[in-house]
Amino acid sequence: MAKSKNHTAHNQTRKAHRNGIKKPKTYKYPSLKGVDPKFRRNHKHALHGTAKALAAAKK
């Protein structure tokens, strides 16, 4: 006779939780890889303007 059971989830959650299910690490500056090129170009200039405004406010 052919085998009948091809899959079971038994013990899988226990194995996963033994080391803890971790969230992916988040970084302060996430990569802009894959972001719309038009947005990236404008973002560069927006950051520069923000830096100038912060510097002026600091004085």
UniProtKB/Swiss-Prot annotation:
Cross-linked sites for Glycyl lysine isopeptide (Lys-Gly) (interchain with G-Cter in ubiquitin): 52
Signal peptide feature range: none
Cellular component GO terms held in the UniProt record: cytoplasm; cytosol; cytosolic large ribosomal subunit
Keywords, ordered alphabetically: Cytoplasm, Isopeptide bond, Ribonucleoprotein, Ribosomal protein, Ubl conjugation
InterPro entries documented for this protein: Ribosomal_eL29 (IPR002673)
GO MF, any single term: structural constituent of ribosome
Regions of compositional bias (Basic residues) in chain numbering: 1-26
Keyword Cytoplasm tagged: yes
Record-stated family: Belongs to the eukaryotic ribosomal protein eL29 family.
Additional note from the record: Present with 51100 molecules/cell in log phase SD medium.
Name listed for the protein in its UniProt record: Large ribosomal subunit protein eL29
Native source species: Saccharomyces cerevisiae (strain ATCC 204508 / S288c)
